[in-house]
Regions:
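Acidic, turn/loop-rich segments in luminal/extracellular domains of secretory-pathway
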Residues: 2-4, 18, 22, 29-78, ...
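Single, function-defining residue in the core of a domain
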Residues: 8
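Short edge beta-strand/loop segments characteristic of extracellular beta-sandwich folds
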Residues: 11-15, 101-105, 195-199
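Proline-enriched interdomain boundary motifs that mark the N-terminal boundary
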Residues: 79-87, 173-181
């Protein structure tokens, strides 16, 4: 037996009843993830090697007589953490819709992945079922302050990976506005006064 991502080693030994006879060990059948040197097997199986692998090692004496050591190595699966495959969108523009879709894969066939928004700015909404992060930043969100994002992908075994990034929101020029209230009435022969006050975001 062997386990995915764990080093495997096995050394075949052979003897001959004929005193002083030389025995040569040859690897006849060996899976690709193993290296065989004079009957010594070493290697580390990966996720793609999970399953059964036949091995045949042949012992040959000086007279050409042979014997075989045949067995099967069963590589058991070890859970692999998910991998984020999407590239985060790290820039946004004030008053424009921002969208980023998180995607991920897992080397374990059939593994179920769950998305969650661990840290999400107030102007954004993360939908776990689709992996979509979207929202529209305002003038208050310009820059990077408060725009850190951490999204988490978790597999069925509880292994997780995070997609962490900061969004930089670019400013869009805002038109000025009046903050004063006009005086809309006046009295004959009385001085009329109104001071207009304007602001800009």
């Amino acid at each position: 037996t062997a386990e995915e991502d764990e080093a495997y080693s096995y050394t075949t030994t052979a003897t001959d009843m004929d005193t002083g006879d030389t025995v040569t060990l040859t690897c006849t059948t060996v899976p690709s993830w193993l290296t065989c040197t004079a009957g010594a097997l070493t290697g580390t199986p990966t996720n793609s090697d999970v399953g059964s692998h036949a091995v045949v090692i042949t012992a040959t004496d000086a007279a050409g007589a042979t014997a075989t050591d045949s067995f099967t190595i069963v590589v058991s699966n070890a859970n692999d953490a998910p991998t984020v495959t999407s590239t985060a969108v790290t820039s946004a523009t004030e008053d424009a819709v921002y969208t980023y879709t998180l995607t991920a894969t897992d080397a374990d066939v059939g593994d179920t992945l769950t998305f969650s928004g661990t840290t999400v700015p107030s102007w954004l909404t993360f939908t776990a079922s689709t992996g979509v992060l979207t929202g529209t930043p305002t003038n208050d969100n310009v820059g990077t302050t408060g725009n850190a994002v951490v999204l988490t992908v978790t597999d069925a075994a509880g292994e997780s990976v995070t997609d962490s990034f900061t969004i930089t929101v670019a400013n869009t020029n805002d038109a000025p506005s009046f903050s004063s209230t006009p005086v809309t009435t006046a009295q004959e022969d009385d001085v009329y006064t109104y001071t207009a006050v304007g602001t800009d975001m």
